[in-house]
Amino acid sequence: MPKMKSHRGACKRFKTTSSGKIKRERMNGSHNLEKKNSKRCRRLHQTALLEGLKAKQIKRMIQA
């Protein structure tokens, strides 16, 4: 049976940390920032960690 291919879209959007957690970028932080307040803009430029079932699903898509 051939090897399963990893999901290329998921590979581009998610990264794994050295401890195995899944890291992602937040949405809505690239343009139209003049409408958003400073606190929101700062928060949108931080990375977020996935938890629970979603992290498990993404790991399967990336590692396949």
Curated annotation (Swiss-Prot):
Does the record carry Ribosomal protein as a key word? yes
Pfam families xref list: Ribosomal_L35p (PF01632)
**GO terms for biological process, alphabetical:** translation
Instruction: List the GO terms this entry assigns under cellular component, sorted alphabetically.
Output: cytosolic large ribosomal subunit
Which Gene Ontology terms cover its molecular function?
Answer: structural constituent of ribosome
UniProt-listed NCBIfam families: rpmI_bact
Which HAMAP family does the entry link to?
A: Ribosomal_bL35
Official protein name in the record: Large ribosomal subunit protein bL35
**What taxonomic lineage is listed for the species of origin?**
Bacteria, Pseudomonadati, Chlorobiota, Chlorobiia, Chlorobiales
